[in-house]
Every structure is written in C-alpha cells, then in structure tokens.
C-alpha cells in the first residue's frame, strides 16, 4: 500500500501558542548534532524496522516503538504538548459536542504532527516510520479520550442527555439493534445471496466474519476498530472467492455483510463507525479500507430501514409465521434477562450493566507506562530507590504482552484452520507466521494458495 506523504499542514491554529509564550518557545534554537543520542535512536529504529516493510501488504505499525521514541529526552517538548492538550480537553468541560471534539482533536493532531519534524528521534524518521509515529500519537490520545468521545461510554459516565450528535449515535444504535433482533431469522436467499454453497459452510464463514467484527468493541483507537472491520471484510471476501462471486463486487459483498450483521448482533456498530469516521485521520483511510468502511455504513443504513418489502420473499405466509415465532422468542429472552438483572449485584462502575470496557490490554499496559512521563519528577535518591521496582514492572509488562500476543496468534491460527479445513495445517501456520498473525493478509495469502 503506497503512503500519501503530501499532507496539508494547517498553520492558522496552534493550540499551545499561549503555553509557548508563557514558558518560552521550546521550538526555537533547537540544535541537532551528528552524535545526538536521539538521532541515533531514530536511525537505529529505521534500520531495525526497514526489513519488516519489504513485501508487506500493510504499512509498518508498532505502537510500542512509538512509546519508546516518545520516552527519549529529545521528545520531552512533545510529551509536554500532549499532556497539556489532554489535561485541557478533560478538565475544561465534561461534555464537548461532536463537532467540537472533531475540531479540537484534528487541530491537535495537525499541530503535533508538524512538531514531529522538529524534535528527535522523530525528526530523522523516514516516511514509513513517521507514519507509524503519527499512528501511535492518534492511538495514544484517543485511548485517553475514548470515554469522552465514544457515545455509549460518554452517556454511561454522565448519565444525562448529551448533545444532539452524540444522542443520535445512541438512538441509531438502538434502532439498529431492534431491527437486528426482529430480522435475525431471515435466510440468505431473502437478501438475494445465491445458494452456491452448503448452509453449514456458509454459516461457518458468517460466524467467523461476525466474530471479527464483534472485536470492534474491544478496542479504543480508531485504527484498531478499523482493523476489525477490515478483517471481517476479508473473511467475507474469502467466502465470495470460494463461491466464485467476488467478481460481482458490492452486489455480492454488501448482502453477505448485512447477513453477518444480522447473525452477529454486534452492539454499538453505528457509534463505532461514526467514531472511526470522526477520529481516524483521513490520510489513513484509503483504498480498500475506505471501500469496506463505506460498505459497512451502507449495510447499517439498509438494516435500520429494513422492512418486509426490502426482502425477497417467496412465501409471505411462511415469512409471517417465522417473524411471529422470533417475536415470541424475543419476548421470552427479554423476560429471562430481567430475571437475571434482579439477581445480579450492582456494579458501581457499571450503573446499568452496559458500560463498555475495551479489552485492548496491550495498549492499556503501554499507555500506563506513558502515564509515568506525566508524573512529577522525584529527587535523585527517590529515583534510584525505584529503579529495581521499575525494572520488575517492565519485565512483567513484557511478559504479559507476549502472553496476550501468543493467545491472539493461537486464536488467529484456529480461525484460519476453520476457514480452510482442506488445507495443510502446517502451511496455514507458516503463512500465519509470515504475516505476523494478521488475519487480513493471512486470508489474502491463503486464498491465493487455494486457487
């Protein structure tokens, strides 16, 4: 994928102009020496990572490398800028409108990306590593601001009406979920999906795609949520590839996507899509990502307006009977849910039992390390006393990250083996290793091998 490095830099807005006037502009008189350790760190990063870019379908991305770069002495001004922005965003108001959030965050990203060109180690990064730094900054700030920008979480925290745009997210989420529940019983043929494979095989692909899409609520950053959309779309494309329907484009893709959404019953999809569109940098949504995101939006719009007339129905009497059976089942499920709620012990952190708690453990761990940069600097003697404890913490973090990544690798391998049951498991594992367990590139490679 080719990066578009011609970024339009807006100069009229500088969110920290007052800070610079008060403290002196740290951008002035910045000198860079050939033996600067910060520059050396950047050059080492470029060398170590360059091999990973060759032959890779996706731009290089490593959030931990970005955090390490941000912890170098030369990046101190960037840390101060980021700390100031986050503190002001969180402290000045409990509720920003969606439009205000978009402008504030977009303006800050433009500002801080411009500052990357002034400070080491970022100043010496090549294009792909600079993109990684920008991706990392987006992930960092949105991880910190998630509960204020993601409508369901914001509403759960404030427990009061929000601005019109945030409330519209919640209303559309409810509308979508209601439609999904009412029409979850429909068959593929009602969506004009050709009957070209056994239902068991179709359901397997649909389950896998729904599972990948369902992971969207586990993550906080727009990029990670977008990856969930991309992975689900790759699974659907795999289904179309096996049934020789991929040449039909959106005419085949969107109906299958609709079917996956109806069967998966993933919550907060409207809010998630809007969150991606609002806070993912436009330069990062290109090509297939833009296509798949637009397709998901089209599928959601179709479902929210879904009626019996939207479907291809051969026997309306049978359809009505199935609809009524499902309606009765929904009533029974609701009654069971009410009984369970009465038996549950209230959770102070989850007043209504619906607050999303993203499970992006690796990101949360690394962000917690970044929080240390925001803490006041202690006396030298105190720092020395904490060295041993800090070293142990870093070892624990590294160990936990490796454990989480290994579990994800195993889960991806199992998913791929279910998708391609006729393929040699050792070959699937080799592809999984080569593609770093990213299900999108893995599916692409395995589809090519299965031709």
From Swiss-Prot:
One of its GO terms (biological process) is late endosome to vacuole transport via multivesicular body sorting pathway. A motif (GBH motif I) lies at residues 229-237. Residues 26-54 have a biased composition (Basic and acidic residues). Pfam families: CUE, DUF5601, VPS9. Residues 15-54 are annotated as: Disordered. The modification Phosphoserine is found at residue 375. Residues 170-312 form the VPS9 domain. One of its GO terms (cellular component) is endocytic vesicle. A motif (GBH motif III) lies at residues 287-295. SMART domains: CUE, VPS9. Signal peptide: none annotated. Residues 408-451 form the CUE domain. Homodimer. Present with 4280 molecules/cell in log phase SD medium. This is Vacuolar protein sorting-associated protein 9. It comes from Saccharomyces cerevisiae (strain ATCC 204508 / S288c).
């Amino acid at each position: 994928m080719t990066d578009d490095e011609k970024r339009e830099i807006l100069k009229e807005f500088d969110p920290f102009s007052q800070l610079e006037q008060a403290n002196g502009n740290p951008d002035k008189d910045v000198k860079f020496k050939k033996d600067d350790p910060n520059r050396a760190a950047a050059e080492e990063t470029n060398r170590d990572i360059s091999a990973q870019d060759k032959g890779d379908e996706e731009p290089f991305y490593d959030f931990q490398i970005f955090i390490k770069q941000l912890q170098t002495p030369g990046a101190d001004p960037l840390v101060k800028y980021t700390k100031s922005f986050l503190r002001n965003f969180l402290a000045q108001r409990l509720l920003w409108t969606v439009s205000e959030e978009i402008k504030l965050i977009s303006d800050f990203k433009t500002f801080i990306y411009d500052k990357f060109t002034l400070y080491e180690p970022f100043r010496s990064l090549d294009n792909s590593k600079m993109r990684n730094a920008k991706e990392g900054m987006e992930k960092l700030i949105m991880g910190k601001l998630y509960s204020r920008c993601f409508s369901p979480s914001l509403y759960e925290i404030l427990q009061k009406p929000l601005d019109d745009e945030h409330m519209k997210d919640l209303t559309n989420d409810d509308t979508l979920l209601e439609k999904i529940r009412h029409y979850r019983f429909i068959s593929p043929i009602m969506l004009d999906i050709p009957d070209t494979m056994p239902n068991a095989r179709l359901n397997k692909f649909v389950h896998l795609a729904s599972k990948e899409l369902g992971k969207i609520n586990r993550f906080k950053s727009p990029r990670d949520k977008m990856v969930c959309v991309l992975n689900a779309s790759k699974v659907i494309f795999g289904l179309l590839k096996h049934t020789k329907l991929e040449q039909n484009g959106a005419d085949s893709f969107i109906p299958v996507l609709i079917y996956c959404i109806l069967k998966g019953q993933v919550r907060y999809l409207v809010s998630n899509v809007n969150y991606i569109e609002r806070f993912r940098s436009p330069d990062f949504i290109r090509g297939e990502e833009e296509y798949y995101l637009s397709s998901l939006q089209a599928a959601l719009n179709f479902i929210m307006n879904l009626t019996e007339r939207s479907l291809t129905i051969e026997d309306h009497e049978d359809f009505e009977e199935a609809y009524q059976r499902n309606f009765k089942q929904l009533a029974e499920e609701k009654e069971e849910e009410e009984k369970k709620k009465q038996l549950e012990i209230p959770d102070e952190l989850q007043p209504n039992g619906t607050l999303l708690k993203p499970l992006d453990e690796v990101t949360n761990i690394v962000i917690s390390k970044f929080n240390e940069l925001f803490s006041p600097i202690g006396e030298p003697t105190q720092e020395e006393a904490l060295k041993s404890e800090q070293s142990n913490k870093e070892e624990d973090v590294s160990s936990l990250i490796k454990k989480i990544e290994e579990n994800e690798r195993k889960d991806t391998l199992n998913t791929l083996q279910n998708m391609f049951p006729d393929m040699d498991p050792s070959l699937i594992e080799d592809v999984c290793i080569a593609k770093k367990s990213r299900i999108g590139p893995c599916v692409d490679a395995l589809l090519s091998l299965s031709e």
